[in-house]
Amino acid sequence: MTSFLTAARTEQESISYDMQRLRLFSGTSNPALAREIAAYLGVPDGPRICKRFADGELYVQIQESIRGCDVFLIQPTCAPVNDNLMELLIMVDACQRASARQITAVVPYYGYARADRKTAGRESITAKLTANLLVKSGVNRVLAMDLHSAQIQGYFDIPCDHIYGSPVLVDYLAAQELNEVVVVSPDVGGVARARAFAKQMRDAPLAIIDKRRSGHNVAESLTVIGDVAGKTAILIDDMIDTGGTICSGARLLRQQGAKRVIACASHAVFSPPACERLSEEGLFEQVLVTNSIPIAAERHFPQLQVLSVANMLGEAIWRIHEESSVSSMFRG
């Protein structure tokens, strides 16, 4: 499997392509990630104006010609989710009206993903609604990372490339030469994700926390299925929101004799009081997340390690532009 911790594409790997036809533009939700992606590809983060009027309306202008170009718009729809989603839709519309040949929405974090099905009467399936909005706005393709559930990929009536942040997390953990590792799913719904992660961790054993949720953002851990005593437990999830699920799981693992606990997640949503919970002394040895969502400096804590997925996203963008395989990035 390709390592995505290298600085940039090497000269030997950089197959010649039409630089004038590949254009990157970032919204305002994560410009730092966009700059890293641009550096990996060796192309500029294109000039644009994104601003807000006094009444709260958003304005976007692309400040160079993109007629006939292959345009990639980098915008995770994290908090403030409604503003960032609307900004992305306006960017797409601006590019479409500027005669871009193809528009790809690069959405490292896909907001509203947890509303992927009806769990009660008269609810909206907002993950599908968001997909519809992107398609209707004029997007030709979506590049997303670690969607909350795999079926969301099928909500799009256009191509959707779904990539995973796990290789970046696995590369980091492999460099630490951990012994006696067990990969733990914080709930039954995450078993497939944890099993895939365990396979990448040299077929590490798997454990599951059986949990019942009593309300939104409230979770109760009941029992551990599997042996964690004396081992390094790696708790893996797609996102950490308030931290309730993963922290209650970590406490249970400690009670069951885990030597140390490491939390891994692609998306650091970190809604309050997540940072206070995650930084609790003696709970986690490390909390590993990616930079799919920007994390303000005041929300950092000693156990936190933020790993960049810029190279991986940049590689996927390059392959889409070159019409080569994206899925092969994650084979072998």
From Swiss-Prot:
It catalyses: D-ribose 5-phosphate + ATP = 5-phospho-alpha-D-ribose 1-diphosphate + AMP + H(+). Binds 2 Mg(2+) ions per subunit. Its main location: cytoplasm. D-ribose 5-phosphate binds at residues 213, 237, 241-245. This is Ribose-phosphate pyrophosphokinase. GO terms for biological process: 5-phosphoribose 1-diphosphate biosynthetic process; purine nucleotide biosynthetic process; ribonucleoside monophosphate biosynthetic process. InterPro entries: PRib_PP_synth_CS, Pribosyltran_N, PRibTrfase_dom, PRTase-like, Rib-P_diPkinase, Rib-P_diPkinase_bac. Its cofactor is Mg(2+). The keyword Kinase applies. The lineage of its organism: Bacteria, Bacillati, Cyanobacteriota, Cyanophyceae, Synechococcales. The keyword Cytoplasm applies. SMART domains: Pribosyltran_N (SM01400). The active site is at residue 211. GO terms for cellular component: cytoplasm; ribose phosphate diphosphokinase complex. It is found in: Cytoplasm. GO terms for molecular function: ATP binding; kinase activity; magnesium ion binding; ribose phosphate diphosphokinase activity. It holds the Pfam family Pribosyl_synth. Mg(2+) 2 binds at residue 187. Its EC number is 2.7.6.1. ATP binds at residues 55-57. It is an enzyme of class 2 (transferase). Signal peptide: none annotated.
